[in-house]
From Swiss-Prot:
This is Small ribosomal subunit protein uS12cz/uS12cy. GO terms for molecular function: rRNA binding; structural constituent of ribosome. One of its GO terms (cellular component) is ribosome. One of its GO terms (biological process) is translation. The keyword Plastid applies. It comes from the Eukaryota. PROSITE patterns: RIBOSOMAL_S12. Part of the 30S ribosomal subunit. HAMAP family: Ribosomal_uS12_B. It holds the Pfam family Ribosom_S12_S23. The gene is rps12-A. Belongs to the universal ribosomal protein uS12 family.
Length: 123
């Protein structure tokens, strides 16, 4: 516990909250252009080929974003919308690509949880 004299000398510093998605610059989503689309393997207990894209955002950041869902049409120079949200078993992947917007089409033949994968209601 500081003394009154110590508090006069230097005041208490407010706790700064660190953002988990700094590249979005406080925006809910950001537009970006894919510079590379590739697959990476997840951390230890899991095994797969996860689809990711290197994206250059309008904020100037170059980030790695996960492409959710089965199958995708994203390639180099595709314009995509990026939201925050990390992938737990992929270190360094802190963003998701939003399916069903801009150049990223929705997941084909998706019946449940459609809104998360940009799929319209089937007729």
């Amino acid at each position: 516990m500081p003394t009154i004299k110590q508090l006069i000398r230097n005041t208490r510093q407010p706790i700064r909250n660190v953002t988990k998605s700094p590249a979005l610059r406080g925006c809910p989503q950001r537009r970006g252009t894919c510079t590379r689309v590739y697959t990476i393997t997840p951390k230890k207990p899991n095994s797969a080929l996860r689809k990711v894209a290197r994206v250059r955002l309008t904020s100037g950041f170059e980030i790695t974003a996960y492409i959710p869902g089965i199958g995708h049409n994203s390639q180099e120079h595709s314009v995509v919308l990026v939201r925050g949200g990390r992938v737990k078993d992929l270190p360094g992947v802190r963003y998701h690509i939003v399916r069903g917007t801009l150049d990223a089409v929705g997941v084909k033949d998706r019946q449940q949880g459609r809104s998360k994968y940009g799929v319209k209601k089937p007729k």
